């Protein structure tokens, strides 16, 4: 039996290092101390600040099943001054990863 771990809240400061960690995990989801609230808010806001695409754009990308990186480019013929024809009319590639794109040309 492990009775020495069951202690009243008033005896909190006398806990050992093992029990301290357990109590932290349990209380993390329910309530946050002032320091943790600040950290939590900062990381949460930081996540949104560094979002690459707007929700509308992500929704469009998801509908058309395109990767975010490819969508950020302008049109397929926008920067090409010499006329090669439209690249979109070519056969679709199977995989969009860099390795496969390099070998599919």
UniProtKB/Swiss-Prot annotation:
Pfam families: Protamine_P2. Residues 43-74 have a biased composition (Basic residues). The modification Phosphoserine is found at residues 8, 10, 33. Testis. GO terms for molecular function: DNA binding. Coiled coil: none annotated. GO terms for biological process: chromosome condensation; nucleus organization; spermatid development; spermatogenesis. InterPro entries: PRM2. Residues 1-74 are annotated as: Disordered. It is found in: Nucleus; Chromosome. Protamines substitute for histones in the chromatin of sperm during the haploid phase of spermatogenesis. They compact sperm DNA into a highly condensed, stable and inactive complex. Interacts with TDRP. This is Protamine-2. The gene is Prm2.
């Amino acid at each position: 039996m492990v009775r020495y771990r069951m202690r009243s809240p008033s005896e909190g400061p006398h806990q050992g290092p093992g029990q301290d960690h357990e109590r932290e995990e349990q209380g993390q989801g329910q309530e946050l101390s002032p320091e943790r609230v600040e950290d939590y808010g900062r990381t949460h806001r930081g996540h949104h600040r560094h979002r690459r695409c707007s929700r509308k754009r992500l929704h469009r990308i998801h509908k058309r099943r395109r990767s975010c990186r490819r969508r950020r480019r302008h049109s397929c013929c926008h920067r090409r001054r010499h006329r090669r024809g439209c690249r979109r009319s070519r056969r679709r590639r199977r995989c969009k990863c860099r390795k496969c794109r390099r070998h599919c040309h």
